[in-house]
Curated annotation (Swiss-Prot):
One of the record's GO molecular function terms: peptidyl-prolyl cis-trans isomerase activity
Lipidation (N-palmitoyl cysteine): 19
Domain PpiC as annotated: residue spans: 133-223
Keyword Cell membrane recorded: yes
Subcellular locations according to the entry: Cell membrane
Full protein name: Foldase protein PrsA
Family classification: Belongs to the PrsA family.
Lipid attachment in record (S-diacylglycerol cysteine): 19
Membrane topology: Lipid-anchor
Function summary: Plays a major role in protein secretion by helping the post-translocational extracellular folding of several secreted proteins.
CC per GO annotation: plasma membrane
Keywords for this protein: Cell membrane, Isomerase, Lipoprotein, Membrane, Palmitate, Rotamase, Signal
Family matches, as SUPFAM superfamilies: FKBP-like, Triger factor/SurA peptide-binding domain-like
Species per Swiss-Prot/TrEMBL record: Geobacillus sp. (strain WCH70)
Amino acid sequence: MRKWMIVAAVAAVFGLSACNNGDSEVIVKTKDGNITKEEFYNEMKARVGKEVIRDLVHEKVLSKKYKVTDKEIDKEIENLKEMYGTQYDLVVQQNGEKAIRDMVKLDLLRQKAAMEDIKVTDKELKDYYKNYKPKIRASHILVKDEKTAEEIKTKLDKGEDFAKLAKQYSQDPGSAPNGGDLGWFGPGKMVKEFEDAAYKLKVGQVSDPVKTDYGYHIIKVTDKEEKKPFNEMKEEIEFEVKQSKLDPAKVQSKVEKLIKDAKVEIEDKDLQDVLK
């Protein structure tokens, strides 16, 4: 999260790239004194300039050799939304979608660089496909006690509206206002008891109460992705299998080698030790 904030904050610094030493253009006026473009630039550079220069160098060098598509970025964004929930929305409000997409793109470029040296077998890919479960979309009603859960299930069995009952009874503040909708999720995103029960349901089917550490859930699956044939998914599966084998040390080592080979020269004396 902090990285996204840094990217957004320093965008202003590089928006002032035309600014040179001695630029006295005033950007803030107060009765106690003004703030010039030069003062702003120097302060921002001192605070976060090294991190941003490093990221810009990485993006420039890696983009020459590796490509990241909008579709790949979109997929990672969806994963982040699932992972961070409402915190993700807060970061978007504070920093903007573009800053987040830029950081996701850079992370993917670094990963692709490191993945180049990772080998996977056809058996690994087929085993992954065999166990692969597509995403599903579900809603739930969460209550603390089994008795209430059973009473709600009885109402549902009699034809009462799921979304209406979720708004009325569910104690999940994140989903209750939306009729219990949890959005799309895949394996590993929910607690095991919830996931196991949800994946057994057909679209439109409602579960009996499911007990987890959070309480009792009544789950309704509202949509399911289809599992595509292996050949259509092979490239995506290969990426995910390689991604699962990555570790920070491999990524750092590969990127450092590529940066060294690119013979980067930093002219600003204040930032010359960034890549060391």
